């Protein structure tokens, strides 16, 4: 089944959801079309399974990066810790940005993505309140939302940037922007 999902992810990234037929996915996976239909009744089911797999990976990454020690890290190191694993994940599978942000996203996938976004905002807001104890809850949520939105935009850009040097430049510039923003929040506490 993973072979089918991996093949679907490659084709969705290369030719888009509409261009990736079930026959092409089966061929890319090196299996018969009957084998594909044994696990997935249609392309939409493949898309849903891919999105679920990605959301599980994202939640797992959140759990690994949001450990109690992150509050003690210098901001540049903190940003590396929070951003780099997600860049790596989206670089490994550029179809993820298409799955979660694209027009092909189903209502269920969109709901799950919104839920994941809310979780990350909650975690970031709590972290920012620890970093800047004078920060009120509403401002912490706003800072968290702005930060999450910038990183989410970065993930979309990373997924569409085939050049490793170009990706690295996008990541570096986004981190510089976030560092300046977050440093002003931490220094000002509001």
Language-model features: locations:
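Amphipathic alpha-helical segments used for helix-helix packing
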Residues: 66, 77, 89-108, 125, ...
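Hydrophobic alpha-helical bundle segments that form small-molecule/ligand-binding pockets
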Residues: 67, 71-72, 92-97, 118-144, ...
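Short hydrophobic clusters on alpha-helical segments that form packing/core surfaces
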Residues: 4, 8-12, 58, 86, ...
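Residues in soluble alpha-helical coiled-coils and helical-bundle/repeat scaffolds
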Residues: 41-45, 70, 91, 104
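Hydrophobic/aromatic-rich alpha-helical bundle segments in the mid-to-C-terminal region
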Residues: 97-102, 110, 130-177, 189-190
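Helix-turn-helix
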Residues: 3, 7, 11-45, 49
């Amino acid at each position: 089944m993973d072979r089918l999902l991996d093949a679907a992810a490659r084709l969705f990234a290369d030719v888009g959801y509409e261009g990736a037929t079930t026959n092409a996915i089966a061929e890319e996976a090196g299996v018969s079309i009957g084998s594909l239909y044994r696990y997935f009744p249609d392309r939409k089911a493949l898309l849903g399974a891919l999105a679920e797999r990605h959301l599980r990976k994202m939640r797992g990454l959140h759990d690994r990066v949001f450990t109690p020690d992150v509050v003690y890290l210098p901001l540049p190191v903190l940003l590396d810790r929070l951003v780099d694993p997600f860049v790596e994940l989206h670089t490994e599978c550029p179809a993820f940005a298409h799955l979660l942000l694209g027009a092909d996203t189903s209502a269920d996938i969109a709901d799950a993505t919104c839920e994941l976004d809310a979780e990350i905002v909650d975690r970031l807001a709590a972290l920012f309140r620890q970093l800047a104890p004078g920060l009120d809850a509403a401002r912490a949520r706003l800072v968290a939302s702005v930060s999450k939105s910038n990183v989410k935009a970065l993930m979309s850009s990373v997924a569409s940037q085939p050049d490793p040097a170009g990706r690295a430049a996008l990541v570096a510039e986004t981190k510089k922007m976030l560092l300046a923003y977050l440093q002003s929040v931490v220094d000002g506490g509001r």
